Amino acid sequence: MQKTGKALAVVMLVVVSSSASATITVLEKNTLTDPWLAPLSLGVSGSVRPEFIWHRGEDNHAGHDGGTRFRFSADYLLRPGTSIIGFYSLGVDTAHALGLKHHYDHDRSWDRQRKLFGGIKDDRYGTLTFGHQYSVYYDTIGGKSDVWGNDGNASANWIGVGGDYDGGERPRNSLKYKNTFGDLTLYASYLLPQDELVLDNSQYYRRKRGGGIGFDYRLAKDLTMSASWNQTNATVRGAGATQRHYRQAFSGAAMTWTPGNWYLVSTATMYRHYVPAVPPQSTDDYFARHGYGLEAFAGYTFPINKPYLHSVQPYFAVDTLRLQGNEHYHANHSYLGIYTQLAYGFSVYLEQTFTATTANDPNVTSLSIYYDF
């Protein structure tokens, strides 16, 4: 019965979303006559993402869920230019929810919270939010290069112990401020303590506190320079009484250039006690002492403007990750792909990843189908 209920929930979400290929406005402002409810607006959007991956290895299989998510937003207008806002994003493993037993990780739940935050937004004084949300690093650096299929192998987003905990991508219990002054956008965040995260080998990670600052500066209409500095204080403890305090630090810079139909971006990030050592080490040396990651992407969009074919974007990307400590780990990836935007919110990524790593990871071919609404 529980599995049937989960399956029906996923099917209902997909069916409801199929009526449009843009964000659905569930409730517009001034729709309700009650003066307390009239300032409220509600929206729903999402992305359904089946994915197929082929490579040499034991976990090579025909298909799985590539990151389906559903988003719910609310905006309550207090006065012109000032609103209370809320946002919730639910990640759903559709293969798990539908009981396709050979196409999902049986050790993970069928659903997970991606974001949950609220706050106040003001046209003059900026936006202040609290909860489970994107980090300053992701807003300024990581999100700029999060634009191809198998990305994120050298940015801080998810190469740490987990972006929900260490501040790399979507930290929980975070307070964030953002404001724009002409061509300059400033960001600042503070990370509150977070519950323990279970690591491999009976080890545990606990965030004590952290924070970050960053900016985007528009040098020209199509050229933006970004930078970010972040620090997280945390402990790693073993199964016994052994533990070590780490002051994790990661700083990055990015340049984004969008002349005409081009999208060009390059990022660089420095790490200290942030990326877990490869291979895994003891509690005292759990993280690589130093490291850096580089990413670059170049894509050109050809507008087709046909009823069922909107555009095609061939692209090329590269990244490299270097770690130094008790190990000297390196990973280089090159990506060649094509992104095709179809009608009714559908799009397709076809990508080949060429890999050269210390761990001898295989090359990967991936096909991702998106339905965005």
Named regions from a protein language model:
Residues 5-47:
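N-terminal periplasmic/intermembrane-space "pro-region" immediately following the signal or transit peptide
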Residues 31-54, 60-193, 207, 216-219:
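Outer membrane beta-barrel
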Residues 46-52, 86-90, 132, 188-192, ...:
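Transmembrane beta-barrel strands of outer-membrane/channel proteins
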Residues 55-61, 96-104, 142-147, 193-207, ...:
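Outer-membrane beta-barrel translocator domains and adjoining extracellular loop/strand segments
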Residues 71-73, 117-120, 176-178, 214-216, ...:
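Outer-membrane beta-barrel architecture
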Residues 78-84, 124-128, 183-188, 221-227, ...:
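Repeated loop/turn-to-beta-strand initiation elements of outer-membrane beta-barrel proteins
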Residues 181-182, 206-208, 213-325:
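Detector for outer-membrane/organellar transmembrane beta-barrel domains
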Residues 217, 257, 346, 361-373:
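Outer-membrane beta-barrel "beta-signal"
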